[in-house]
């Protein structure tokens, strides 16, 4: 489990830096092994990341001296493969041609996607960066859905399109808040983190629900991409994911104490499962998962 967050400013107003700092710090509950952020300024992609939790990164000069840009993507990492001591493994991942991504999820077939091509990192997320940054005709996001086996909540920026934010969702959460007074769109892996950091509360009067002040909540639908430009929503498109036989190929392993990746029968997110362990809990929803639960779903 990792965390992604960020924002897109449509006008000249920038977010309250203290609130963005609070949100970034709260996001470390989803990953404390590394953290980072990326943005585009003067047609240059700028990435700051380190093998520290976000509450420590926000104390660094890179963050303290930063004037918030128009668009930013951010990440907190819980490592599943690839040491955090190799900063290439930490997010945001970025390519030589100026694409940067943050990813929450699991890719099972990254070796298939890369083949014999040389890799810069040791993490499965690199396959998503590869598919989004290669120069080829056609819809790059469709290519992602066509080829990736796994789950992903992705935010991406590209220096060739500096006014755009790309959000892509398959099985992992992306929640959105639009602040109409400041004309800023925020996104995060968890709605509650945004609510707490920005002090967003439900307002009622005489029994009428008046919403959440100037904040308007949206939840991205599964298997969709959202492209935001300087004027608003450029596209919101549904895709068909690649069909796989994960249960037979991925969810069983030979050893009783081996760790396997399963789909939680309660929230349908990917989580770790130890066949020989007495108690397993989903890292996303916290529900206990038993062998009987899995048989009821997949049997």
What residues fall within each predicted segment?
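Conserved short alpha-helical segments that host acidic/polar catalytic motifs at enzyme active sites
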Residues: 1-299
């Amino acid at each position: 489990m990792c965390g992604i967050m960020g924002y897109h400013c449509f006008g000249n107003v920038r977010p309250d830096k203290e609130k963005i700092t609070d949100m970034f710090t709260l996001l470390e509950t989803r990953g404390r092994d590394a953290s980072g952020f990326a943005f585009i300024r003067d047609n240059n992609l700028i990435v700051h990341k380190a093998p520290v939790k976000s509450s420590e990164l926000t104390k660094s000069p890179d963050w303290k001296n930063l004037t918030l840009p128009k668009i930013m993507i951010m990440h907190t990492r819980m490592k599943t493969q690839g040491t955090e001591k190799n900063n290439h493994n930490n997010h945001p991942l970025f390519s030589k041609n100026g694409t940067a991504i943050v990813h929450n999820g699991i890719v099972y077939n990254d070796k298939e996607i890369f083949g014999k091509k040389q890799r810069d990192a040791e993490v499965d997320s690199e396959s998503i960066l590869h598919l989004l940054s290669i120069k080829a005709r056609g819809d790059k996001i469709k290519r992602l859905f066509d080829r990736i086996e796994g789950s992903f909540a992705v935010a991406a920026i590209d220096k060739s399109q500096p006014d755009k934010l790309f959000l892509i969702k398959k099985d992992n959460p992306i929640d959105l808040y639009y602040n109409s007074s400041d004309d800023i769109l925020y996104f995060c892996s968890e709605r509650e983190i945004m609510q707490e950091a920005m002090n967003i509360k439900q307002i009622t009067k005489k029994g009428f629900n008046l919403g959440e002040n100037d904040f308007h909540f949206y939840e991205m639908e599964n298997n969709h991409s959202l492209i935001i430009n300087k004027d608003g929503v450029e596209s919101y498109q549904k895709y068909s994911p690649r069909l796989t036989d994960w249960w037979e190929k991925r969810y069983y392993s030979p050893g009783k104490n081996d760790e396997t990746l399963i789909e939680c029968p309660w929230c349908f997110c990917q989580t770790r499962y130890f066949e020989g362990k007495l108690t397993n809990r989903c890292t996303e929803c916290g529900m206990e998962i038993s062998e009987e639960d899995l048989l009821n779903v997949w049997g």
